[in-house]
A protein has these predicted regions:
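Gly/Pro/Ser/Thr-rich low-complexity, intrinsically disordered segments predominantly at protein N-termini
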Residues: 1-184
Length: 184
């Protein structure tokens, strides 16, 4: 006798359900994940720093934009909300419909496993060219680049300038600017 299977008892919500919920949620393979409590001040400041750095970096690229907290509807059972994304040629105005060029997630204790494992896998499968995971407690960020369908770690960055030059709108991020105000 094999191990019991419980998949049939798990909830299986859809985007239509998701739209009706109050508060902040993500929906991954039909399972809801609460995005509460709201992010701490340092989390929001670091996300804002990425938003600014990336906006400055792509300012001359008219078909790309940098946004935060916008839903990405992958299919009817998966809708996620990255912290910061670089979008190019996005036709929809209510949610993201195609893979962003760059995604930034700022880690918190409550989202670490989801950002480092589940979303890492989703972003890799969806062919997001760059995934940045920022760690406020360590004042560093891991930068991953999609190479032959798999993420290759480009480094743990703290003070460096990283150039994203093989995407539609090249950009750079000065990681010293991202973390400077938090250094003692």
């Amino acid at each position: 006798m094999g191990a019991p299977r419980f998949e049939e008892y798990l909830p299986n919500y859809t985007y239509d359900d998701y739209k009706l919920w109050g508060g902040d949620w993500e929906l991954i393979d039909g399972i809801p994940y609460a995005m509460s409590p709201s992010p701490m001040k340092d989390h929001q400041l670091i996300a804002s720093n990425f938003l600014f750095e990336l906006r400055v970096g792509i300012k001359d690229c008219s078909n790309c934009m940098v946004v935060s907290e916008l839903d990405w509807k992958l299919n009817d059972s998966t809708t996620i909300r990255p912290d910061v994304v670089v979008l190019c040629d996005e036709p929809h105005d209510k949610y993201i419909t195609k893979a962003p060029q760059i995604i930034v997630e700022v880690i918190s204790k409550s989202t670490a496993m989801r950002d480092e494992k589940i979303k890492f896998q989703i972003y890799q499968e969806e062919k997001v060219p760059y995934y940045i995971i920022a760690y406020p407690d360590d004042l560093r960020a891991k930068v991953y680049k999609l190479v032959d369908g798999k993420y290759d770690k480009q480094g743990d960055l703290t003070h460096e300038v990283f150039q994203f030059d093989d995407i539609e709108c090249s950009a750079s991020v000065d990681f010293d600017n991202i973390f400077k105000r938090f250094r003692k």
